[in-house]
């Protein structure tokens, strides 16, 4: 089961969501609003009982995917995180137990919204199976996003 989690100021009608809807018609692409807690409660309801999850999270959606995987690791197959806001909680905001699913992060070297060094610090600690791609792009990853091999990334 594939799911895309959009960023804080985006929606299920954003550029990435539209791309995924066209490319993967069976992908879940819900809308989220409200606080992190409200968003996570909605995500819990949407994914209740589902397994084999291949989660794509963009920015704040990357944080959501990370938190979900920490709480439900056996149900998550892989994470693909795009400029994820994993620095939002700071290094001490995550449990000591790492998330052992495969994780791919694509992060722009010119990201002025979510600093790459902070993401590297947190992600390196919580994702032992991390593949980090630093790309010549900004936070939105407009130059990079469509060039990725999504069929391989999402298996």
Identify the function of each model-found stretch.
Residues 30-32, 132-138:
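Short glycine-rich catalytic loops that host catalytic nucleophiles or stabilize transition states
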Residues 10-11, 87-88, 110-114, 139-140:
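Acidic catalytic loop of the alpha/beta-hydrolase fold
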Residues 74-87, 102:
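A conserved short beta-strand
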Residues 1-51:
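Active-site catalytic motif of lipid deacylating hydrolases and related acyltransferases
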Residues 99, 104-107, 111:
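Short beta-strand/loop motif that positions the catalytic acidic residue
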Residues 137-148:
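Catalytic histidine-centered segment of alpha/beta-hydrolase-like enzymes
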Residues 57-66:
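Gly/Ala-rich beta-loop-alpha elbow adjacent to hydrolase catalytic centers
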Residues 16-17, 115-124, 146:
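Short alpha-helix in the alpha/beta-hydrolase fold that links the catalytic acid
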